[in-house]
Design a protein with these regions (language model features):
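Mobile active-site "lid"/loop adjacent to the S-adenosyl-L-methionine
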Residues: 135-161
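Class I (Rossmann-like) S-adenosyl-L-methionine-dependent methyltransferase catalytic domain
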Residues: 35, 83, 97, 144, ...
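Core SAM-dependent methyltransferase catalytic element
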Residues: 198-199, 210-243
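Conserved SAM/SAH cofactor-binding pocket of Class I
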Residues: 46-127, 133-136, 142-143
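N-terminal auxiliary segments of SAM/dcSAM-dependent transferases
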Residues: 1-24
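S-adenosyl-L-methionine
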Residues: 24-55
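Short amphipathic alpha-helical segments
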Residues: 102-103, 146-149, 189-192
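Conserved Class I SAM-dependent methyltransferase catalytic core
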Residues: 158-209, 213-216
Length: 243
């Protein structure tokens, strides 16, 4: 009975209560990004470390950026609002997160710059999508927070499926830069599945060689096997990026 009550609470009561919560917004550049607190999986805090990280890599302005596991799109809209890209694509499986993204697009007049997909991983992405840069703050744990979309990736299946399908959406020379958490993984956690998908790790920044007992954000840079890393990666390395 206790388990049944918990299931009712999680599937019925909490979703109804969440709909009553008020909308908030945070501003990145000229863009007001709308969200509710329960939709934030860290994009509004640690996710914004992408901005100085990519700036330190000397990233040139990108034509099109995709944010995987976007939630309300904090990272993607921040990159767009601060001039890191011309256009943006976001996707998430959570309909509430998609509603937040649509609210942001409508209220900021971004319909001609932003594409939004309600998608289980990349399953519902239009085949015509082509991205220069992919970013994402996906669930960071395979062994904790089961049932919590923002944090749990059972047996790393979400990551594995992503790596298997993302290459078709990358432009030639396109790059993936994922934000991960050393408390839940290391770069080696993903190396095998990245390799099996025909991709290659081109840099790792900020990762210890073991899982840590505390939160430690790190980044993995990934490309198709055989492709030459862009010049800005090498320029950024002289500024301190760790390969």
């Amino acid at each position: 009975m206790p388990n049944a009550l918990k299931l009712i609470e999680r599937r019925i009561i909490k979703p109804r209560l969440r709909r009553l919560k008020r909308w908030r917004y945070v501003t990145y550049g000229h863009i007001h990004v709308h969200y509710k607190d329960h939709l934030d999986g860290g994009g509004r805090t640690s996710g914004l470390n992408y901005l100085p990280f990519l700036r330190d890599l000397n990233l040139p302005r990108q034509q099109r950026v995709f944010e995987w596991c976007a939630g309300p799109g904090f990272i993607g809209f921040a990159l767009l609002g601060h001039g890191f890209c011309d256009t943006l694509c976001v996707a998430d499986i959570n309909p509430e997160a998609i509603a937040a993204c649509r609210r942001t697009v409508a209220n900021n007049g971004l319909a001609n710059k932003v594409a939004i997909y309600h998608s289980d991983n990349l399953d519902s992405i239009a085949p015509s999508e082509q991205w220069d840069l992919v970013v994402g703050n996906p669930p960071h744990f395979a062994d904790s927070a089961p049932g919590e979309l923002r944090f749990h990736d059972e047996d790393w299946n979400l990551h594995r499926r992503f790596f298997k399908t993302v290459a078709r959406f990358l432009k030639p020379g396109g790059i993936i830069v994922l934000l991960e958490n050393n408390c839940g993984s290391t770069a080696e956690t993903f190396r095998g599945m990245i390799d099996e998908a025909g991709l290659s790790i081109i840099f790792v920044r900020g990762c210890e060689g073991r899982r840590t007992p505390y939160t430690r954000i790190y980044y993995i840079g990934i490309m198709r096997k055989g492709e030459t890393p862009p010049a800005w990666i090498h320029l950024g390395n002289r500024g301190g990026a760790v390969l």
